Amino acid sequence: MNMDILEQQLQELPLYGYFFIDPKDLEFNSRIRWICENECPMCGKTWACPPGVGSVNSCKAKCLGYSNCLMIATITEVEDISNIDETLATRPEHEAISDQVGQLLREQGIEPYILSTEACAICDRCAILDGQPCRHPDRMHPCV
């Protein structure tokens, strides 16, 4: 991977910021899962969300299989950050940028494991609700 080229490409995207980190330095715990399970209306309704996405430990194992992690941040204004529905509505713009970053990594020969902070919205009705496998596993970003 050519880091200079990648960083130049990242600087051309509408990112608030980005940084690289060793996956061993990431913190994996169940606090975020608690929010999913107790506050998010999408929990259990998409393959990107618990329990479909797997356990925190399975996510940790997959992340630790990488030698480097790229964290990106975008900013979208909302009136009330505590309004989960309003916050979830900002998903499409961020996911589109995540997809662009994923493509840049693929062009460098890296198959990324893209995690998101929100549920998947690719399909109108997720296959998990019908007991079927994900129809778009190559496009779905699992929720952290």
Segment roles from a protein language model:
Residues M1-D22:
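TRNA-binding/sensing appendages of the translation machinery
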Residues Y16-T46, P50-V144:
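Catalytic cores of enzyme domains
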